[in-house]
């Protein structure tokens, strides 16, 4: 993935971003794509979806026209046969050698990964946590490759990907990084998911909480809950007699979520796929639901199940407009309407847009 972007001075390039050539026009394209998918797959106009027709930048990305935000807290570098650092060209295995990545967050750039050769490595992923000084590199050796001596410009934990089973193993330092969001610290283990933009987690929590408006004693579901970001946010707002059930399919993410939320005894995390675990819980009703499914969406069967639980509000977090629109149509068939939809540019200079849709029963206006 490497699409060169002419920076304001026309002399520098940003690599590994889709649609870099659109530059300032990128958000307008995101708006057009989202509007098109809502109409085509859900039959919704922006007004019917409660969307103001804008894609909002994250806090800190409101830069002068032509400026490029340094936002990626996680960058996976490709290594060529000579051990040089680069990024893969878009839809290609070819490696474009770079000396810097302008969209890398400062904590990643300060590691100086590009300054070192990485013989016998296939990729080097650099991570800089938000809200802590944790930094990490994850090395993927070529077949039979030996790990190099890692000498970077900042202290860093080192992990490696096993070429046989794909597992991620600690070499030295911590096997996790500590991220901050919503005044809580979240442990994110090796290979675990966390939003790449430094402001994304807080931005999404605010949007979800403003839409759900949790009340004391609410019973809530957090589906595809990851390391517990939304479960933690809801759990802090529903009082001691409230309850949150989180469901997550990733074993390591479940371990992290249980660790992260151990101070909230009203929160329980279950391991497994949502479409398998949820029916087994015996839950027939709840007050709130938040779901942040993978790119393919939740799907018809899961949406049908959720629509039957009578939730007062549902928050749907999506990174793919098409999957969101399909599932919104399923929710409409299940008796729900979209109250509001907000779109955020949490992947600047790429074709991705993050959305938060708030739904409520069509028969109500709460």
PLM region spans:
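Local alpha-helix boundary/kink/capping signal
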Residues: 8-13, 22, 299-300
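Intrinsically disordered, low-complexity segments enriched in small polar residues
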Residues: 11-13, 27-29, 40
